[in-house]
């Protein structure tokens, strides 16, 4: 009897210190969590949009498109050209040629303004091009009256390149949205892995505490030895589970680190003591979804890209229609011996309607098979694009509604899961009370507790799934949710 009282005293002291130790350990854990840096979704947003290589690469798309516009503007750059040739043989000057011209392409009517100076002298110079020693100055225009009057290749190229700036901007937004969506999914996977680890770790702590308590009662003879064995098995099972989720947490942290870069373009790694922000499932109103659908119809990157292609094909179609016209180019120049404005030149050698040079060029393919075939090809591409635009708009709208339905399903499931967790906690508490009275078994307590942990893990999985579905809702609408 005396030994039994001593054993009871030792067990009471052991349980007292265990409870104190667990309380201290819990306080220390809370202190660590409090002191650890909370890596919020807003922090991730700052890293991604500021330093992510793909985001920086996407910005180059718009720069490249503007570079193409600049390149297309080069077709309208004024050009200066000159040529000189001279031949002397046997004390005779066969020819002395000097030709120079400033050509200024004009947007209007596809014309070219030409200012030139020619000096062709010598004993054997062609009479058609022979000039006086002072040479001839000419100012004139080259105008296409048929093909190229409404639109030509250089105007078509410039217009198309300007439209492609909008295409490139839409592609930039699309790539940035994709990067952010993947980052958000990885963040909530990390959140789930972290919460799962916390819950399983708490389960290990509870199982160890129960094992020590049951072992003490077994020594006193109040509990059969098999209960101690069962409690130890539960501890080991949960430790195995803890090691598994520990690896999952490490992997999730590494995957999230893929999105972290410094401002010096060096990769960063998420600190081990970093913890995710607290999360809950907030309700999404149907009004928000309707707004996203309307916004997607106007601004979704895929639709913007298709509309840009449609505009590009419309310009190409106009150009191909222009190619069906005959080519009629008229050139004309007013001529003068004047080399500068401060020199005297007789009126009959100065600029006037009696001193000119004019030319006409005409060509027209009889069957126009190449031109008609190209125009037909452009029309077919336009029809294909119209069908693609129609289908893409419908798919985007249905994708947004699908994400909304997923969110509503998560809301309902979470509400039920939270109630079930409350009920399970009541069951566990009641089972523990029955066990203390000797009316239950350790197996039932472990089962109730394991079920509770599984339900809590499932709740965190639902919360993470809800947050990923919310990010997917905005992504499928062609935008993203700011974390301000």
Predicted regions and their residues:
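Sec/SRP-type N-terminal targeting helices
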Residues: 56-60, 73, 108-134, 146-171, ...
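Bacterial Sec-pathway N-terminal export signals of envelope proteins
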Residues: 25-97, 141, 146, 150-156, ...
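C-terminal segment of classical bacterial N-terminal signal peptides
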Residues: 15-24
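Amphipathic alpha-helical coiled-coil segments
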Residues: 45, 57-72, 175-200, 234, ...
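Periplasmic alpha-helical coiled-coil/stalk elements that build and connect Gram-negative outer-membrane
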Residues: 170-292, 406, 410, 451-452, ...
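Small/polar, glycine/serine/threonine/aspartate-rich low-complexity segments that form flexible
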Residues: 27-36, 83-143, 274-285, 318, ...
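Bacterial N-terminal signal peptides that target proteins for export
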Residues: 1-10
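Gram-negative outer-membrane assembly/targeting C-terminal domains
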Residues: 26-30, 465-484
């Amino acid at each position: 009897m005396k030994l039994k009282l001593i054993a009871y005293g030792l067990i009471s002291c052991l349980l007292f210190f265990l409870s104190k130790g667990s309380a201290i350990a819990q306080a220390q854990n809370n202190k660590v969590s409090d002191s650890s840096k909370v890596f919020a979704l807003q922090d991730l947003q700052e890293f991604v949009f500021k330093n992510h290589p793909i985001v920086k690469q996407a910005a180059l798309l718009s720069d490249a498109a503007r570079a193409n516009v600049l390149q297309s503007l080069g077709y309208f750059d004024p050009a200066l050209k000159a040529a000189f040739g001279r031949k002397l043989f046997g004390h005779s000057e066969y020819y002395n040629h000097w030709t120079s011209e400033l050509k200024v392409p004009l947007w209007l009517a596809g014309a070219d303004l030409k200012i030139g100076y020619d000096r062709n002298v010598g004993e054997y110079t062609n009479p058609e091009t022979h000039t006086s020693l002072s040479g001839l100055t000419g100012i004139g225009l080259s105008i296409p009256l048929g093909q190229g009057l409404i639109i030509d290749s250089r105007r078509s190229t410039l217009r198309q390149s300007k439209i492609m700036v909008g295409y490139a901007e839409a592609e930039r937004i699309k790539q940035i949205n994709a990067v952010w969506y993947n980052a958000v999914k990885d963040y909530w996977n990390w959140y789930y892995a972290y919460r799962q680890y916390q819950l399983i770790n708490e389960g290990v702590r509870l199982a160890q505490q129960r094992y020590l308590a049951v072992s003490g009662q077994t020594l006193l003879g109040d509990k059969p030895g098999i209960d101690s064995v069962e409690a130890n098995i539960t501890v080991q099972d949960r430790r195995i589970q803890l090691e598994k989720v520990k690896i999952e947490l490490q992997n999730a942290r590494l995957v999230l680190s893929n999105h972290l870069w410094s401002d010096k373009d060096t990769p960063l790694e998420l600190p081990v003591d970093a913890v995710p922000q607290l999360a809950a499932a907030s309700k999404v109103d149907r009004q928000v979804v309707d707004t996203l659908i309307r916004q997607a119809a106007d601004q979704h990157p895929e639709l913007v890209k298709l509309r840009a292609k449609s505009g590009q094909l419309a310009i190409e179609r106009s150009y191909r229609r222009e190619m069906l016209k005959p080519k009629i180019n008229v050139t004309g120049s007013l001529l003068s011996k004047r080399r500068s404005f401060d020199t005297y030149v007789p009126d009959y050698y100065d600029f006037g309607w009696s001193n000119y040079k004019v030319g006409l060029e005409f060509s027209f393919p009889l069957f126009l098979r190449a031109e008609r075939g190209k125009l037909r090809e452009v029309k077919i591409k336009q029809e294909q694009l119209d069908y693609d635009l129609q289908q893409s708009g419908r798919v985007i709208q249905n994708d947004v509604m699908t994400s909304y339905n997923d969110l509503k399903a998560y809301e309902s499931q979470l509400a039920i899961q939270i109630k079930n967790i409350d009920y399970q906690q009541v069951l566990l508490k009641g089972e523990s009370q029955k066990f203390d009275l000797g009316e239950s078994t350790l197996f039932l307590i472990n089962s109730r507790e394991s079920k509770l942990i599984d339900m809590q893990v499932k709740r965190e999985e639902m919360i993470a799934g809800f947050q990923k579905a919310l990010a997917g809702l905005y992504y499928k609408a062609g935008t993203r949710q700011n974390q301000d």
